[in-house]
């Protein structure tokens, strides 16, 4: 377990809280509010990302960093370099931010659309459920019984569509916290203990990467235990 897994769930929880307050503060969630949300998020993340991307390009080009300059292309500019397909050889660290950026894009769009039909409480629940279930289905559909650890890492652990559920668990936690605050307050201690036990068990269970457990179930259990 590394800090990225914690970051995904925590990010979903914090951003989920912001979005919940946003959709409950008005009877009509307008498209201008979508752009306002994106503008705030992108002003916080994109300038630094592009600066580091540029620095990486020159470091690799002039062989200060030992990576492959031929792996660089426009997809790094729009965060599609690891959307469906694995990437490696250039700017390895960018995988997690790409997942985060797509979460910023997709979640508010779901909320905007579902609010046309459902009340805020049900809208947010459905959105969180979609974010949790779709990546699991995708991972199951793409199960590979001949994969090694390297390809498990780049093809499952570090692609956007495989990992959005980690943030989805954070969204679900923010929904429970917002609408069922008393339940949360009464049960946080036993939940923390049980979650910690589950996490310790999951991360210490040595299972080969070519199994359904490692490719499909593992990520869900880790995120659920953090939630």
What are these regions (language model features)?
Residues 58, 167, 171-172, 189-227:
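Alpha-helical transmembrane segments of multi-pass integral membrane proteins
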Residues 93-98, 184-190:
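Short, amphipathic, aromatic/basic-enriched membrane-interface segments that mark the entry/exit
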Residues 10-11, 52, 121-141, 192-203:
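Small-polar-interrupted transmembrane alpha-helices in polytopic inner-membrane proteins
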Residues 67, 84-88, 120, 150-160, ...:
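Membrane-interfacial loop-to-transmembrane-helix junctions in polytopic alpha-helical membrane proteins
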Residues 6-43, 48-64, 107-116, 171-178:
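Juxtamembrane transmembrane-helix termini
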